[in-house]
Amino acid sequence: MMITFMAWCTGEDLKPRPFSGFTILAEHIRPDARGHVRITGPRPKDPPAIRFNFLETEADRQAALAGLKHARRISQTDPFAECVASELTPGPEAETDDELLEHCRANGLSLLHGVGTCRMGTDPTDCVVDPRLRVHGLKGLRVVDASIMPRIVSGNTNAAAIMIGEKGADMILEDARA
């Protein structure tokens, strides 16, 4: 779990509100659920079918609850507590786990750093690229970015994406010399 503090108040749309406040985001950075992206047609302009599978596993639901409850506890400690007039979202009326999960389902979102849409692995029925980043079943095409990560790293993906780019460049050069 990563806790992010913002020195402004946001609503469910994450847009700043025209009054003073702060926002605490509880970000589950290693979810268990796996989504997918599928091609829907032969044309490049055909929109993809995207299934996020947010909160599909019990572990993810428990992590969301723990993060939200932890953010609430933080807001009740000094010096935060003296700044809080009221909780805007999910709001003090959301008390039970079911109510809190409903808030998470309705308002949870993916923040940046999507990975795994072209997952790397040896099984072409389950993975897009092989361990040398070549697209299974196609000659001359590689994917060299964060989309090849089989699972997301525990934090910002920038360093891992740079490493993938460096390693991918090395592989391309090695294969060109062979």
Predicted regions and their residues:
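FAD-dependent oxidoreductase catalytic-site/capping-region signature
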Residues: 1-160, 168-178
